[in-house]
Amino acid sequence: MKELAIVENDQVTGQGAWDFGAAAEHSLGDAALKTALLRATGKFDIGRQEIMAELPESELVREKARQIKDDVLAHLDTYLARFADSVAAAGGTVHWATTTDEANSIIAQIARERGVKRIVKSKSMVSEETHLNKSLLSEGFQVIETDLGEYILQIADDRPSHIVVPVVHKTKEQITDLFNRAFNKKLSPVPEELTAVARERLREEFCRADMGITGANFAAADTGTIVQVTNEGNGRLSTTWPPVHVVLMGIEKLIPRLADVPVFLKLLARSATGQPLTVYTNLITGPRGHSEGDGAHELHVVLVDNGRTAALESRYREVLRCIRCGACLNTCPVYQTVGGHAYGGVYPGPI
């Protein structure tokens, strides 16, 4: 079998030197991978179909969301300027990054200037795009992933294979074995046992963190509000416990108005995991106010281009509408068979 090697291209629309055929052949020989993929993607795909059937106007909502995103893409410069002004008016700071290296450098500089040592991260696909963890670790910072799936991958020295469920390629038995070796435990492959161990260890990390880094599902240009949806409490802890909160987001995540958020919330969880709404929906507008009891004292938003403006003027323009629900992965027979790693990029699948 061929040795698998990737030469990555940081541009969103670029093509790296990757042999999909060899990677797919490698994946096809992994019985545990096949079990994990079919179990998870089947569940999410069926869940999406069932819950969308409960929303009679689902196609109208999708069309409305498409119109909103098309408006943003047609006037992106205007909305970016409006968003930057709104964040500043709310007490936050906006930073502009053309490349992945610039984004990583900006975040490292913010951390150095504030004497940051420990950083907790909530799930962020853009941070995978920029290889942020590797960059920060090389600068001497301690970085801990706090999304359960990402935490498992960090312990395993692995990478995500799905944009919503990053550890979808591992079975609970494999995760149990990993935890037992990493933490010197004798756990059973019971989800409640595994999450209890992770919760206990991550709680300590939140208490000691000097900085929290998150992504953004959406960002409202008129108010500067960051919208973050999660099914775990890690997102809220990452944004409220550490004194410094850094948001790393692609420039395409903007929506015009805070009033547009419900349109996308009706779609995102339904399409991603078959839920009417995620467990947590966080709306963050600026740093902690004088009368507020929680929240970061500083809010920094790093807006990343990394090929997005080039995509805007290309045949790939439509990809910038993507809301990262992952439904295309869950329903794709190729992805269901070979998984995300076979594609060789940060964003796998058939979009």
Tell where the protein language model's regions lie, with residue ranges.
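Conserved phosphate- and dinucleotide-binding cores of soluble alpha/beta proteins
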Residues: 199-200, 204-287, 292
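Short, glycine-/Ser/Thr-/acidic-enriched flexible segments
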Residues: 101-102, 125-126, 150-151, 170, ...
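Gly-rich Lys/Arg/Thr-decorated short loops/hinges at beta-loop-alpha junctions or inter-strand turns
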Residues: 59-67, 81-90, 173-186, 241, ...
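Generic secondary-structure signature for well-ordered alpha-helical cores
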Residues: 81, 85-93, 112, 137, ...
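A glycine-rich phosphate-binding loop feature that marks nucleotide/adenosyl-phosphate handling sites
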Residues: 102, 278-291, 324, 338-339, ...
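N-terminal leader/transition segments
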Residues: 1-139, 147
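Conserved alpha/beta enzyme-core scaffold
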Residues: 82, 102, 114, 120-219, ...
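Ferredoxin-type iron-sulfur electron-transfer modules in oxidoreductases and energy-metabolism complexes
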Residues: 291-319, 329-330, 334-351
